[in-house]
Amino acid sequence: MRKSICWRHLLASFALVSLALTASAIAADKVQLTIDASKAGAKIDRNIFGQFAEHLGHGIYDGIWVGADSPIPDTRGIRNDVVATLKALKVPNVRWPGGCFADEYHWRNGIGRRRNVTLNPNWGGVVEPNTFGTHEFMDFLNQIGAEAYVSVNVGSGTPHEAADWLEYMTAPTTTTLAKERAANGHASPYKIAYLGIGNESWDCGGNMTPDYYVSQMKIYSRFVRNYNPAQQDKDQMLKFAVGPGGAEPRFVDWTEAVMKAYQQHTWSWDINGLSMHSYTVVRWQDKFKSLGFAESEYAQFLKETLTMDGLINRYSAIMDKYDPQKQNARLAAARIGRKRLGQRCNGGLEVSLLKFGEAEVEICSPGNLGLRASAFL
């Protein structure tokens, strides 16, 4: 069963290696690299190629979703070219809804024939039509052959709301919520492989203190249940708590609080991992271009990603202190690239490494196609 996987088992990992050679070294030595494709190498976990979709720029609307009346070729409103690309990449999982949007998302706005039109205050106050909701997301996953990583609203939502959402998605059609799901077009329960308990709760997810988040984490872990009969014994849903957000000292306190709670967990609640986010910042203002950026800018971006190793070691040490046997949780170390290579295509490029839960990479194309990748380490 999945719950037996140890903390240190990385669900996914993006490896970015930067070699800095001085001009004199290049002149003095000739570097030769040989790759023997005939020999088997290390096994790479498929979850490294996971994706992450956020309601930001054209990442969802026009990027994944164009609607049934669009001139762009689509299947039930989902772009065929995006599906073909992600199927070719063999994407294993997609996290949604992501980013600050996740803690202001109310799932009932995105189901049924009549959708509530709201605003997205995190990204310019743009109109959120909610035409891409639960069923559209799950249809998207089915089309590309990926598993669901659902992030529930802890910041402005309630445990009751999150519990209802999971029941709506996963229960057999013996309950009222499951019958509503069936009436909306999907009779069989959905499979939810991963559950995120909030997003960056130390910042836009609610500006919570460590102790307050821990109290919420326990409640959500207890009452947000997966009812899918196929996931009761095997393929059980994994629950990820919000982890640290970089190298600031306050995130040591945060990780200590979450891991101390994990060490003392009882039969009634549990978590399976932490999600660590770290922003690769070259410059917040005057972001680099998505396309046509300079080689020196790309080198700066790669250099910044190397700090992830130190963060993984720092927070792994804290995890080891409270879970020395590495029994039942993993660190999702997410390297989020805020170089903003994707600003020019309304989304940007975000690179995330997740040691214990997810990695995020947003990819932009000239056609305003915005996608993100969410991988597990």
Regions found by a protein language model. Give the residues of each.
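Active-site His/acidic residue clusters
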Residues: 281-299, 351-353
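Non-catalytic accessory regions flanking glycosidase/transglycosidase catalytic cores in CAZymes
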Residues: 25-273, 304-348, 355-377
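Hydrophobic residues within membrane-embedded alpha helices
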Residues: 9-12, 142
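Histidine-centered active-site/metal-ligand motif
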Residues: 277
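Bacterial N-terminal signal peptides
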Residues: 11-22
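N-terminal secretory signal peptides that target proteins for export/translocation
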Residues: 1-7
